[in-house]
Each structure stands twice: as C-alpha cells, then as structure tokens.
C-alpha cells in the first residue's frame, strides 16, 4: 500500500491500527465509529452490516462499515462474544474547534474479561478475568471483576485443582504465558472450560515486576500487607492480571482497592461434573436457571446478592463454625418475620453498589448513577436498625460493616438534580443553589430567552406582519421568518439570512446579540456543569473502599435473608453440623423437584451414613423409580447445609464434607475421540484418586458402558476399593448389577437399599420409597411399556426374559470361549482375573493406564 498517497485521516487510521493489529479498531468519525479495510470486511460479515467504501487517496476505495456511536455497546458486545478484541479510538478534541486532522487515541481495549459497560454485562453474574501460571510443582490463580473491583488470588497444588477453581469461578477470559507449566496443559484447559484464552509475554509474569505492581496498586510496603508474602505463584498471576487490565483500560484501576487471598481448602471442592450433575446453577437440559438449585434459592433483591448467592452455592464452607454462624443468622431472620420483611423491603431499594463504585472509579458514572447511589444510601440507616435487633453474631458483624455513607448522600443531594439526563456534557445536572456563578449564568440566559420568546409578538405588532415568527435551527441559529406575501412590509433593519421557496429568513443586530449571549452562555453552562460534576465524582471516589465494604456486607445480608425467606416458604429446617462422619436425613426432599410437582406430594426418604457401619449404600431398583433423585437430593441437602441454608427435611445431621463427587450418566465425547465408557472410566479414576475419608461420592451405574462381565468386574472392584480402610469415603452407589448385593454380608460398611415397587395385574407402580434390602428385578420391560414401546416387541421381550431366567436359553458364544473363567470370577476360589483386578492400585493409576488394564482384562475374558 502506497501510504504517501493516503489521505491524512486514513494515515492516522493505519498508524493506529498498526499498534493494535490483534484488535478490531473502532475509529470515531463524528457520530459514527468506522472500520476500514480488513476490519470492515470482517465486521460487516460478523454483524451483517452493509459494506461500503471510502475515498482514501488510493485508486480503489477503502472497504468501510460503521456503527452509530450512541449504539456502539451493542455492536461491541456482539464482536466480543464472537471472539474478537475491540480497540476503541476516540476523538480527543472538538472537530469544530480544531484546524487540520482531529487528535484521536485508543481509550480502551475490550476483551471478554475486561468489559465494564453495564449494558454489556449481566447484572446477576460476575464477569471475571482469570490469570494462571505455574512451574509444575504448583499453580497460582488470580481473578478480578473489573466492573466491581472484586479481586481474589490463591495457589493450588495440581492441574485438577486448578481446573476446579476455574470451573468454580466461571471466568469470561483466561490469561497465561508460554513459559508457564500451564501452557503444556492449555488444550486440556480449553476443552474443560470452553473459555477464551489469551497468551501473554512471559514478562507479565516475572516475579519482580508483578510484585512491584501489586505494592503500588495496593499502596503497601510489603506483600505481607496483602497476604501474598509466601505465595509467589499467586503473586505472579495477580500482578500479570493487573498489568493486563491497566493495558486494556488505559487508566488507573481505582476500583481495585484490595485483594482477597484465600485457601482453597476453606471451601467444599466441587468439580465440573458435580456442578453440572447436581444442576446447582443451571439445568442439564436447557442450561437455564429455572429448574436449578439456584433458581429455587435465589430470592435475593439486589444484583450483588444474586451474584454472591451463586458463589456461595459453588463454594460451600467446610468448617463447622463458619457454617453455624450462617445458619444462626438464617434462623434469626426466619424467626423474626417483621424484621425479615422490612430488610427485604430495604434491599429492594438498593442499586448495585459494587458496579456504581466501579463506574465512579473509572470515571464513567453519570448523573443517573449518582442519584441511584444516593437513593441506595438513603435506606442504609433503616437497614442497619433492623439488623441491630437480631440475635446473630454474623448479622451484628455485617451491620457494623455497613457504613451510613452520609457524606456521599449529602454531597449528591446538594449538587445533583433529581431528574438529570444520562449525558453529562449537555447540562441539566447541577441543582440550583449549588454554585452562585452557575446560577448567575443561568439567570442571564433565562432573561435572554424571555426576550427572544417575546420578540415575535412585538415584531408582529411593530411591522404589521401577522404571520411573522421567530425560530431556531442548529445551522443558522435564531431567525425571523417572513412569507413572500409580506416582503413589502419587511423593515430596513432586517438582514437577509436564508431564502426558502415561500419565505425569507432574517436576522437583526439585536437578535444576533441575544443569540450570541444565549449560545455562549449555554456552552459555558454546559462546561461548568460538566466540571462541577467531575469534581463531585472525584470527591466521591475517595470513598470507594468504604462503598465496596458496604456492598460486600449488604450482599451477604441479601443472601442470608433469601435463605430465610425460602426456608420459611418451603418448610426447611436448621441442620446440625459437626466434625463427625455421620450424615443423617429424616424425610428428606429434593428442593427443586418438589417445586414442580403439580398434583400430589413429593415422596420423602430417609438417609443414614457413617464411616463405620454404613459408608457404602448399594441402591438397586428399576429405572424411573427414583434412585438418581434420591442420591442427588441428599448431595444437595449436604451442599445447602454447608452453604448456610436450611434444608428440606424433618431433621438433619451432617458431619462436614470436604468434597462432593458425582458420576451420573455419560455420553460420548466424539470431538476428543472418547467413548462413553472411556469418559465414565476417566471420571471414576479422577474420583478414586481425589476422594478423602471426608468426601461424599455419588456413583450411578458404574460399568454399564461395556460388556456385562467387564462392567460387573469394575463395579465390584470399585465397591471393594471404596469400602477399604484406606479410603472409606461415604458413598451412594446405584446399580443394576444385582450380583453386588451379596457384598453386604462380606464387607463391613455396605448396606443394601432398594426403591419400592408395587405390582398390580402385570403392571408396576413406582412408590419412590427407599427401603432396606435388595431387589433382583429391574422391571425393564415394564419401563419400556410405559415409554410406549410396541406391544409385539414387549411380548417377545417377555418371552425371552422368561427363557433366560429359567436357564433354557443361553447367549450365543464361540466354542473357544471359556465360560467357567467368567462364572467363577467372584467365587471363593482364586482366579487369575480376580488377582489381576485386586493388584491394581487405583490411587496411582492414570486414565490411560486404566484403559490398558481394561484391555488386558478383556483379552483374558475372551480367551
């Protein structure tokens, strides 16, 4: 491209684009953001915009497309969603007041994790940028929501733990570097999280520069002041993240006032499969909140509370005292109905303190934001009063952390108009009486406008022109309009300004003088109001940390009040929490399913587990009878209790659980070349290698993805391993392998349960009741009948079932198959196959090794 032939504006565009090659450049030209050349082609295709052209000095016109500046957020959001980084290049001076090319600068780079515009954010979700790094012996992770200023950092020991943290926080973007050990697992992270990933230069993560950045940002003398003195990996991740944010925001990060350094062991660990299978924040079927646990429990009244509710459900506590403090707070709120209702009414009037503070710190808050902040602050005294009367140490603590913020309230109340516009550059923001100089200017312009408004009547009377009128437009300013039929009556002091088809427009020296006074005064008023507003905003910025502290406390009050509200409405009870190993639930219910039962009542069930005599519950019964629901509901009850919520049952005792694992259902991962069975075995290996004696494990139909004997072998060995003294994790194991039920008499800690079914006239009725003992029937044909399978097929299936059960028919086998080896697999006599299975150390076996072992077992079976 011959740059010397380009127009000055296009040279400016290309020079800017050269600095932001990896971004779509939105270049401000008047009332539009324009894109040129390749960017224009890309954007016109992605957003279905018209592709035009612009003369640029070259022989061919430059491809061009544009979007209105006032609607840019909508288009930027769509581009970011499609995986593009967007650089916004703004006009830095008034085009009408400068000579030559207008000065332009990139004022912000927008990426998935750095969005600050409220119109592009979901109010009930955090928008986290995550930063990860490591050296193979451990990893650092930091994450921040730039729109709220919330910032966190931690260290983890291995990649599995890092993946769990990433899933838990659900970031919108991840940054790392090629020099990190994380880079070797980048494909695994991408597949596991499906989050946009940005690789940065290694210099971002250098310990010295990262530490220096943190010390400057948080104004501390050493890392001890922010809790990172012995966490260098977390320090590097956090420093790199803040550097990246500074680079994209192009301004100081005033909303990031503190960093919360946490230990991952302080909360229950939930992996991706568990969050998905228990439908904690969204449903498996259509990925919506309705139908999930969050959909039932989230009756919060603020956006801050709703975001925190999601965090609490993904990170239940695993220490007795903090859990009890939350439960005591919920109890106090539940018992005092009047206070609870008053608190909820206060919260309904509270806007998003966090994001309002973020907008003030970033300089993007407008007059509407200020009045929203003032109105939110106005209810804090009543909120504090209601909290002070409740018997709860946690609520007392939160009440003390809510600052009245009176100075901010008074500052806004005195200065900002009640009904101010969204824009801050066109006046109408500052209250009368706040500035004498501003009021004086407004008075002078008022007098001039009154003179102008009375001019048409006085001129009609003076000239005798009955249809004379005074008007205004942006191009010609004020004018006096006279129709053609009255030209002969026009006075000599009228100066022609514009000719129309049927009229002439004039100006007089007096009108011109008043016009100058009005327009100059308007510009001065707008400028003065803008400067006063910015001054007020800067003054409030000094209170950002106080606002954020109040936001954190109000959000917690909102979640606790929501827990109390839902518990009262649904008849939940306060669980007992201790450090023992017992989980006991009397008449437990599934909190979500019971909400969707239109007719009838949800069938409640009991649960009792401990590590000594009932660590393994083997659950048999037909499909659709309720095995999975029973297991899920008990896992959810544990999760709810440790999150601090009351639970759906008549009584409940829970010995703290450190992790919940679920292996429920499976499907092929075709993109990764993995079969259903491989996915199932990978998940099982992960659980067996990660569980502790304080874990709760939910296993549904282990081994069904392969042949009967292979599957039974794996299920059998898994039960034995989980009941071994080495682990003894509390486990619920649903299976159709009825052969496993004999283990109740052989291994201490195994208890058989089954789902009760009633048979009437060849039909079955699912009672959904869990009872002691085992069942030897799966009722598969009955379930097929309920599903609408053709009668002819069902009759044939019933005949075949009778033959198989009587032993009159045997599966077709080759002459070379040695059935005795399979039939004696679990006999009291030793067999090579059983020895092989027993020799496998599942704690040390990787998924790939497990697959090879399974292949060897299969070869033995087929000999």
For the regions a language model picked out, list residue spans one by one.
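Charged catalytic and DNA/RNA-contacting regions of genome-maintenance
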Residues: 2-332, 348-361, 365-457, 584
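Hydrophobic alpha-helical segments characteristic of transmembrane helices
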Residues: 344-347, 353, 371-374, 548-556, ...
């Amino acid at each position: 491209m011959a740059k010397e032939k380009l127009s000055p504006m296009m040279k400016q565009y290309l020079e800017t684009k050269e600095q932001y090659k990896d971004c779509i450049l939105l270049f401000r030209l008047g009332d539009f953001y324009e894109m040129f050349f390749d960017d224009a082609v890309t954007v016109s295709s992605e957003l279905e915009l018209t592709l035009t052209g612009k003369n640029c000095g070259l022989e061919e016109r430059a491809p061009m497309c544009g979007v209105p500046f006032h609607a840019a957020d909508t288009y930027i959001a769509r581009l970011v969603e499609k995986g593009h980084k967007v650089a916004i290049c703004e006009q830095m001076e008034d085009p009408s007041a400068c000579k030559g090319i207008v000065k332009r600068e990139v004022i912000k780079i927008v990426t998935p994790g750095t969005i600050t515009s409220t119109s592009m954010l979901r109010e009930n979700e955090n928008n986290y940028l995550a930063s990860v790094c490591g050296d193979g012996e451990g990893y650092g992770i930091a994450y921040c929501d730039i729109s709220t200023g919330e910032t966190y950092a931690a260290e983890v020991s291995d990649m599995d733990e890092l993946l769990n943290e990433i899933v838990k926080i659900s970031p919108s973007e991840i940054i790392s570097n090629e020099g990190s050990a994380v880079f070797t697992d980048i494909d695994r992270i991408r597949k596991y999280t499906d989050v946009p990933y940005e690789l940065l230069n290694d210099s971002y993560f250098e310990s010295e520069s990262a530490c220096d950045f943190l010390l400057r940002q948080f104004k501390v003398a050493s890392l001890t002041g922010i809790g990172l003195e012995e966490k260098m990996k977390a320090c590097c991740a956090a420093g790199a993240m803040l550097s990246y944010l500074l680079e994209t925001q192009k301004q100081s990060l005033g909303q990031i006032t503190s960093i919360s350094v946490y230990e991952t062991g302080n909360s229950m660990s939930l992996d991706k499969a568990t969050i998905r299978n228990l439908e904690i924040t969204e449903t498996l079927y259509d990925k919506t909140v309705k139908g999930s646990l969050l959909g039932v429990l989230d009756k919060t009244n603020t956006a801050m509370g709703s975001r925190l509710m999601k965090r609490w459900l993904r990170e239940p506590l695993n220490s007795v005292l903090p859990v009890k403090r939350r439960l005591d707070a919920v109890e106090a709120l539940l018992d005092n109905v009047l206070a609870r209702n008053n608190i909820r009414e206060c919260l309904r009037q509270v806007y998003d303190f966090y994001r309002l503070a973020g907008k003030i710190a970033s300089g993007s808050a407008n007059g509407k934001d200020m009045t929203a902040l003032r109105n939110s602050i106005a209810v804090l005294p009543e909120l504090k009063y209601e909290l002070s009367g409740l018997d709860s140490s946690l609520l007392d603590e939160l009440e003390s952390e809510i600052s009245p913020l009176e100075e901010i309230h008074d500052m806004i109340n005195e200065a900002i108009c009640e009904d101010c516009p969204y824009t801050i550059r066109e006046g109408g923001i500052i209250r009368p009486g706040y500035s004498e100089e501003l009021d004086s200017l407004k008075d002078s312009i008022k007098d001039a406008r009154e003179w102008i408004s009375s001019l048409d009547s006085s001129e009609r009377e003076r000239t005798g022109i009955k249809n004379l009128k005074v008007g205004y437009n942006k191009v010609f300013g004020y004018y006096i309009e006279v129709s053609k039929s009255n030209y002969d009556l026009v006075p000599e002091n009228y100066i022609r300004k514009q000719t129309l088809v049927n009229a002439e427009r004039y100006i007089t020296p007096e009108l011109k003088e008043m016009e100058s006074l009005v327009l100059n005064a308007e510009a001065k008023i707008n400028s003065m109001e803008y400067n006063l507003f910015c001054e007020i905003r800067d003054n409030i910025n000094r209170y950002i940390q106080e606002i954020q502290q109040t936001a954190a406390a109000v959000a917690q009050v909102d979640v606790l009040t929501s827990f109390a509200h839902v518990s009262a409405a649904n008849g939940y009870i306060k669980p007992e929490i201790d450090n023992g190993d017992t989980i006991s639930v009397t008449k437990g219910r599934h909190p979500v399913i019971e909400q969707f039962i239109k007719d009838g009542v949800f069938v409640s069930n009991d649960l009792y587990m401990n590590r000594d005599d009932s660590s393994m519950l083997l659950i048999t019964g037909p499909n659709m009878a309720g095995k999975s629901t029973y297991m899920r509901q008990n896992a959810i009850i544990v999760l709810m209790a440790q999150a601090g919520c009351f639970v759906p049952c008549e009584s409940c005792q829970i010995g703290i659980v450190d992790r919940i694992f679920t292996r429920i259902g499976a499907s092929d991962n075709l993109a990764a070349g993995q079969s259903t069975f491989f996915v199932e075995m990978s998940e099982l290996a992960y659980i067996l290698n990660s569980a502790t004696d304080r874990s709760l494990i939910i296993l549904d139909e282990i081994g069904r993805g392969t042949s009967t004997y292979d599957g039974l072998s794996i299920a059998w060995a898994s039960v034995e391993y989980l009941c071994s003294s080495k682990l003894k994790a509390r486990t619920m194991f649903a299976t159709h392998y009825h052969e496993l039920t004999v283990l109740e008499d052989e291994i201490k800690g195994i208890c058989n349960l089954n789902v009760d079914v009633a048979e009437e006239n060849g039909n079955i009725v699912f009672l959904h009741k869990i009872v002691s003992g085992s069942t030897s029937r799966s009722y598969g044909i009955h379930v097929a009948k309920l599903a609408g399978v053709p009668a002819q097929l069902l009759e044939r299936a019933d005949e075949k079932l009778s033959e198989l059960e009587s032993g009159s028919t045997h599966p077709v086998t080759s002459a070379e198959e040695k059935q005795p080896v399979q039939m004696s697999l679990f006999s009291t006599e030793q067999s090579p196959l059983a020895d092989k299975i027993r020799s496998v150390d599942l704690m040390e076996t990787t998924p790939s090794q497990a697959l090879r072992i399974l292949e060897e077992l299969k070869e033995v079976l087929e000999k």
